[in-house]
């Protein structure tokens, strides 16, 4: 199995990147926490989880081993597959997720698209003890990056659609936000997610 990839970023979007490793382009699914931490171009290393199904092999990449550990913990819960685990990490930062699981915050967990009350309760029940053993001291909040407003809004729409939100709902929330010309993708995405989770 592939555990680590190092290569050039050939393409970057909120839910995946194409990583060029010695002339071979790997499509690697990523959560927003990893997206925020990646440069627009250059050489990067990603911790990889390889998901093998009968019809596909998918790679999930994480900037830190802690993110990968959270991803694998989430996969250990019945009813949580790789896409849902990635979506959870896209909606809730690792430190917040550890806190939500530790405190049994069902409301925060069930606000993620695809997670109902029963799944949120199962997450808390099965992961509460395991999450307490993870070292969260390496969690770093990334610096926001600036981009043109039109591109920014389209990237936010794309990211939210990939998370399972419906386009009319996303457009309505974005219409109510005022990102301004100096807004970052991270900032607008966080504002939109907060509005959608209410």
Curated annotation (Swiss-Prot):
Subunit structure: Homotetramer. Forms an RuvA(8)-RuvB(12)-Holliday junction (HJ) complex. HJ DNA is sandwiched between 2 RuvA tetramers; dsDNA enters through RuvA and exits via RuvB. An RuvB hexamer assembles on each DNA strand where it exits the tetramer. Each RuvB hexamer is contacted by two RuvA subunits (via domain III) on 2 adjacent RuvB subunits; this complex drives branch migration. In the full resolvosome a probable DNA-RuvA(4)-RuvB(12)-RuvC(2) complex forms which resolves the HJ.
GO CC annotations on file: cytoplasm; Holliday junction helicase complex; Holliday junction resolvase complex
Species annotation: Pelobacter propionicus (strain DSM 2379 / NBRC 103807 / OttBd1)
Protein name: Holliday junction branch migration complex subunit RuvA
UniProt entry keywords in alphabetical sequence: Cytoplasm, DNA damage, DNA recombination, DNA repair, DNA-binding
UniProt GO molecular function: ATP binding; four-way junction DNA binding; four-way junction helicase activity
Function: The RuvA-RuvB-RuvC complex processes Holliday junction (HJ) DNA during genetic recombination and DNA repair, while the RuvA-RuvB complex plays an important role in the rescue of blocked DNA replication forks via replication fork reversal (RFR). RuvA specifically binds to HJ cruciform DNA, conferring on it an open structure. The RuvB hexamer acts as an ATP-dependent pump, pulling dsDNA into and through the RuvAB complex. HJ branch migration allows RuvC to scan DNA until it finds its consensus sequence, where it cleaves and resolves the cruciform DNA.
Gene it is expressed from: ruvA
Principal location class: cytoplasm
